[in-house]
Regions:
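NTP-dependent small-molecule kinase module
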Residues: 322-327, 334, 350, 354, ...
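Domain-level signature for soluble enzymes in the chorismate/prephenate branch of the shikimate pathway
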Residues: 1-86
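Phosphate/diphosphate ligand-binding glycine-rich loop within oxidoreductases
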Residues: 87-187, 278, 284-286, 290-293, ...
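Adenosine-phosphate binding glycine-rich loop
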Residues: 274-332, 469
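A glycine- and Lys/Arg-enriched "phosphate-lid" helix/loop adjacent to the NTP-binding pocket
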Residues: 423-458, 462-465
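Glycine-rich adenosine-cofactor-binding loop
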Residues: 91-93, 172-177, 184-185, 193-213, ...
Length: 487
C-alpha cells in the first residue's frame, strides 16, 4: 500500500526529471531566439503553440487535457520571454535605478537591475547570459577592458554605457551622448559658442564633453579633484555660461550636498545635473533660486535609454512616450506650506484619509519627540531653539519623505529647509486671507500682517501651485486633488 510519503517521494523524483528537462528546453529556446532575432522572425508563433498542445493532449482525459494546457501555457509564456532575451542595467553595489521602469514602458518586460562589484565586472560580462544591458557608475570606463568590440563613438568618448551581445561577442556603445544632446534641447539650454564647465572626469563626463563638441560649444573646462583644473582653480571656470554636473555629489533624497557653490559663477545661463534623484538636487535648487534655467538628468536617462532600446534590436519608442515618462517618473509627493492657521494640517489629513496616503506634520512630529506642545517649547526655550529642532526634523524627513508633509508656517525661513522642502516633492502653498487665519495656539502669530508680508515672497518662490483656502475647505481639497491628478 502506498503511503503519502511514498507517493510524495515519487513526485519529487519526477519533479527532478521535469526540472532538468525544462532547463534543457530553455537552452534550446534561447538558441531559437537568437536565430529568430538574426533572421527577423517574430517571437510569438501561435500556430506552433497550438500544434504542440494538440499533440500532447490527443490521448488524454478532459481533466488531463486541461492540466496540460494550463502548464504549457505557462511554459510557452516563459519560452517567449527567453526567446526575447534578458536585459538590464549594471551598476555598483548601491545601484538604484529608474531604468527598469523606463525600458518596461518601452515594451521590454525582461529588463532588470544588477549590482556588480568592480572586481567581478569581467566575470559578469562573460557569464551573465544577458542579450544586452546598460552600464552606469562606476563601470562605464572599466567595462571597456571586458568587451570584445567597442563602437567608434564609444572608443572616441572613452566610455561605454550600452552593451549588446551579437553572436556571443560583447560589443560596447555609448548612447549618453545622444541622450544628453536631446535633453539640453528639451530643456532649452544652448551651448553653441558658450563656455561650458563640466564637473567630473568619469565616463559620463567623457560622453558629455564629446556631445558638447558636436554641439559646437566654445571653451570646455573639465573640473575634477585631481585633473589639470581642480575645484580650487575657480578663476579657470567662474566665467562659464553653462554648468554640467557629472559627479555623484548630491545623489539621494535629502542629500543636500553640492559639488560646487553656485555663487562662484557670475555669468551662468544654464545648469544641467546628470543626477535625477532627488529632483531638484541642491545644485539645481540653488541655481533656480538665482533665476537660472536648471534641470536634473531624468530626461537624459529616458532618451539615452530609447537609443539603447533600439540597439537591443527593438523599435525606437514613439517620442510621445518621452514626455509621459518624464511626467510619470517625477515625484508625486506633496508638501503643504502656508501661514499658521491657513488649514494645512486639516487639508493634509483629508488628503491622507481620502487616498490612503502616508502623512507627517512637522509640528506634530516635534511635539511627539519633545513631549511638549509647540507654544510651550517656544515659551520655555525660545524661537531659535524651536527652529533648530524644526530644521533637524525637516532634514530627517527629507531622507525618506512620506506621501504628504505639512509644514509649520515659518519652516520656509531657513535656506537649507527650502532645499529639503523642494526635494521632498511638489510644494503647495495654502493661501488664506490674514483676517481669516485661525490664531489659537500660535505664539508666533502676534503680528500676522508683518509675518505675511515677510513670508509671502518666499512662499511664492517655493510653490509649484497656490491653493486658495478662503472658501469652504472642500473647495481647497478639490483643487489639491485636481493638482495631484495632473501629475
Amino acid at each position: 500500500m502506498n503511503t503519502i510519503d511514498n507517493l510524495r517521494s515519487q513526485i519529487d523524483s519526477l519533479d527532478n526529471e521535469i526540472a532538468s528537462l525544462l532547463l534543457k528546453r530553455l537552452d534550446i529556446v534561447s538558441q531559437i531566439g537568437k536565430i529568430k532575432a538574426k533572421s527577423g522572425m517574430a517571437v510569438f508563433d501561435p500556430t506552433r503553440e497550438e500544434k504542440i498542445i494538440k499533440r500532447l493532449t490527443e490521448n488524454t482525459t478532459p481533466a488531463g487535457e486541461e492540466y496540460i494546457k494550463t502548464i504549457y501555457n505557462t511554459v510557452f509564456s516563459s519560452s517567449r520571454n527567453a526567446e526575447k532575451g534578458k536585459y538590464g542595467v549594471v551598476g555598483g553595489e548601491s545601484l538604484v535605478s529608474k531604468s527598469p521602469d523606463i525600458h518596461k514602458a518601452f515594451g521590454n518586460e525582461n529588463y532588470f537591475s544588477f549590482r556588480v562589484k568592480p572586481g567581478d565586472l569581467c566575470d559578469f560580462v562573460k557569464n551573465s547570459g544577458l542579450s544586452g544591458y546598460n552600464v552606469t557608475m562606476p563601470h562605464k570606463v572599466a567595462i571597456m577592458e571586458c568587451l570584445d568590440e567597442i563602437s567608434p563613438e564609444a572608443a572616441e568618448i572613452g566610455a561605454v554605457n550600452t552593451v549588446v551581445v551579437k553572436e556571443d561577442k560583447k560589443i560596447g556603445y555609448n548612447t549618453d551622448c545622444l541622450g544628453f544632446i536631446e535633453a539640453l534641447k528639451f530643456h532649452g539650454i544652448s551651448v553653441a559658442g558658450k563656455k561650458v564647465c563640466v564637473l567630473g572626469s568619469g565616463g559620463s563626463s567623457k560622453a558629455v564633453c564629446f556631445a558638447l563638441k558636436q554641439e559646437k560649444a566654445g571653451e570646455i573646462v573639465m573640473v575634477s579633484r585631481s585633473g589639470s583644473v581642480t575645484y580650487a582653480d575657480t578663476d579657470a571656470y567662474a566665467d562659464s555660461q553653462v554648468l554640467i554636473n557629472c559627479t555623484p555629489v548630491g545623489y539621494g533624497v535629502g542629500n543636500g550636498e553640492t559639488p560646487v557653490c553656485i555663487d562662484v559663477f557670475k555669468n551662468l545661463e544654464g545648469v544641467y545635473d546628470l543626477i535625477y534623484h532627488p529632483d531638484p538636487t541642491r545644485l539645481v535648487f540653488d541655481a533656480r533660486q538665482k533665476g537660472i534655467n536648471a534641470h536634473n538628468g531624468l530626461y537624459m536617462l529616458i532618451t539615452q535609454a530609447a537609443h539603447a532600446h533600439k540597439l537591443f534590436g527593438m523599435p525606437y519608442p514613439d517620442e510621445g512616450i518621452f514626455k509621459k515618462l518624464y511626467k510619470d517618473l517625477s515625484s508625486k509627493r506633496i508638501v503643504l506650506m502656508g501661514m499658521p492657521g491657513s488649514g494645512k494640517t486639516e487639508l493634509g489629513r483629508l488628503i491622507s484619509t481620502a487616498f490612503n496616503l502616508s502623512r507627517v506634520d512637522t509640528d506634530e512630529m516635534i511635539e511627539a519627540e519633545t513631549g511638549m506642545p509647540v507654544p510651550e517649547i517656544i515659551t520655555k526655550h525660545g524661537v531659535e531653539y524651536f527652529r533648530r529642532i524644526e530644521k533637524e526634523v525637516i532634514k530627517r524627513l527629507a531622507q525618506n519623505p512620506p506621501d504628504i508633509v505639512t509644514l509649520g508656517g515659518g519652516a520656509i525661513l531657513d535656506m537649507d529647509n527650502r532645499y529639503y522642502i523642494k526635494a521632498m516633492g511638489n510644494v503647495l502653498w495654502i493661501d488664506r486671507d490674514t483676517k481669516k487665519l485661525e490664531r489659537k495656539r500660535r505664539p508666533l502669530s502676534v503680528d500676522i500682517e508683518k509675518l505675511a508680508k515677510d513670508r509671502y515672497p518666499i512662499y511664492q518662490s517655493l510653490c509649484d501651485v497656490k491653493i486658495s483656502n478662503n472658501g469652504h475647505i472642500s473647495d481647497a481639497f478639490e483643487e489639491i486633488v485636481r493638482f495631484m491628478q495632473s501629475k
